[in-house]
Amino acid sequence: MTQVYNFSAGPAMLPVEVLRRAEQELRNWHGLGTSVMEISHRSKEFMQVAEEAEKDLRDLMQIPANYKVLFCHGGARAQFAAVPLNLLGDSRSADYIDGGYWAHSAVKEAQKYCTPNVIDVTTHDNGVTGIAPMKQWKLSDNAAYVHYCPNETIDGLAINEEPDFGNKVVVADYSSSILSRPIDVSRYGVIYAGAQKNIGPAGLTVVIVREDLLGKARTELPSILDYKVLAENDSMFNTPPTFAWYLSGLVFKWLKEQGGLGEMGKRNQAKAELLYGAIDRTDFYRNQVATANRSWMNVPFQMIDPSLDKLFLSEAEAQGLQALKGHRVAGGMRASIYNAMPIEGVKALTDFMAEFERRHG
């Protein structure tokens, strides 16, 4: 059987060790004679799963004690509404950094609840897109918070700086880059991330929120999106996505076994450098993102002759290189190389790219 590497942007590849363990435990979890999917979320057995998952995530990210960790539904799109309704209070304005597709999507949702101060930080130079340094961002004085997306999956744009905005409340959508390298959680008021890219399967959303920001929700906020309600109920205000929570917990343990986020950062940088190097080495392929803002997680690329795209994708698929088609709004190709993608998968892709160019260049 051909070795398969899944380059999907999400739902994304999971560590094979995690899948094997889940397979082994699927029908008889911990000797109970049933699946973890079938037990009560309030049972002592599942409570242990939940507690261990939170502890391991706190250890991995070094989350300070004055932050709550919530395991929620709804993905990042639910958080696009939850953030303003939890944090605006009496304010009518928040700063929204617009650096790509998902940042702009957050703006559109926030417009239902406030008047966002939209700050376009993209730069354009001879067809190459980048992001202006944070020191050039024109933040307002009276914003309730500053929202940005550190990694844009579609555009392949990354903001690699961490925020240093004094006392401003910083909110970050880390859906596609959480756990890919160490970050300083204390620089943020809220971090949120859909699980389906770098945490676990779709259906779970992780929210990390500083305790002093709880209890400011607007009255019209649905209880299921209220950070204070979720925190007071240990993320079990309603039945949570238990299987996704369990699998994410296995991923956290796998990350610790691999050496933690420092080690993952080294691996992810090496994978990205290998793939960008293959693209930059030739005129046959191109990436139109400024070097300083190239994503380690999502690498879009185009061929000089777009008529070859379909052939490239079909031949790649035949060799076990799956899900390389670019997003519908961007076209071309995109390789998502999250934590679970081994460097062998990236080497297989770059070898295929070189061979394809040899035959069609």
Curated annotation (Swiss-Prot):
Q: Which cofactors? A: pyridoxal 5'-phosphate
* Residue numbers of N6-(pyridoxal phosphate)lysine PTMs: K197
Source taxon at top rank: Bacteria
- Which GO BP annotation is one of this protein's? pyridoxine biosynthetic process
Q: Paste the cofactor note.
A: Binds 1 pyridoxal phosphate per subunit.
Record-listed E.C. numbers? 2.6.1.52
Q: What GO annotations for molecular function exist for this entry?
A: O-phospho-L-serine:2-oxoglutarate aminotransferase activity; pyridoxal phosphate binding
Q: Provide the catalytic activity annotation.
A: O-phospho-L-serine + 2-oxoglutarate = 3-phosphooxypyruvate + L-glutamate; 4-(phosphooxy)-L-threonine + 2-oxoglutarate = (R)-3-hydroxy-2-oxo-4-phosphooxybutanoate + L-glutamate
What keywords does the record list, in alphabetical order?
A: Amino-acid biosynthesis, Aminotransferase, Cytoplasm, Pyridoxal phosphate, Pyridoxine biosynthesis, Serine biosynthesis, Transferase
InterPro entries recorded for this chain?
A: Aminotrans_V_dom, Aminotrans_V_PyrdxlP_BS, Pser_aminoTfrase, PyrdxlP-dep_Trfase, PyrdxlP-dep_Trfase_major, PyrdxlP-dep_Trfase_small
Give a Gene Ontology cellular component term annotated to this protein: cytoplasm
This protein's record includes keyword Transmembrane helix: no
Q: Which family does it belong to?
A: Belongs to the class-V pyridoxal-phosphate-dependent aminotransferase family. SerC subfamily.
Free-text function comment from the UniProt entry: Catalyzes the reversible conversion of 3-phosphohydroxypyruvate to phosphoserine and of 3-hydroxy-2-oxo-4-phosphonooxybutanoate to phosphohydroxythreonine.
Q: How does it assemble?
A: Homodimer.
Protein name, UniProt field:
Phosphoserine aminotransferase
Please name the gene that encodes this protein. serC
